[in-house]
Amino acid sequence: MEEQPECREEKRGSLHVWKSELVEVEDDVYLRHSSSLTYRL
């Protein structure tokens, strides 16, 4: 019973890392897409 909170914290931490990584990837794709658009213009 005492081990549950630790597992929950671990999951929340990994989820936070996953979210931040996803945001970084989205930003990278967006920047690359916008730069290619400006390059075409």
Curated annotation (Swiss-Prot):
Chain intervals for the UniProt region annotation (Loss of recognition by cytotoxic T lymphocyte (CTL)): 9-17
Record key words, sorted: Adaptive immunity, Immunity
Outcome recorded upon mutating residue 10 to A: Decreased CTL recognition
Tissue expression pattern: Expressed in acute lymphoblastic leukemia B-cells and Epstein-Barr virus-transformed B-cells.
A single BP term in Gene Ontology: positive regulation of type II interferon production
Domain of life: Eukaryota
Role noted for this protein: Precursor of the histocomplatibility antigen HB-1. More generally, minor histocomplatibility antigens (mHags) refer to immunogenic peptide which, when complexed with MHC, can generate an immune response after recognition by specific T-cells. The peptides are derived from polymorphic intracellular proteins, which are cleaved by normal pathways of antigen processing.
Binding partners and assembly: HB-1 forms a complex with MHC class I HLA-B44.
Name of protein: Minor histocompatibility protein HB-1
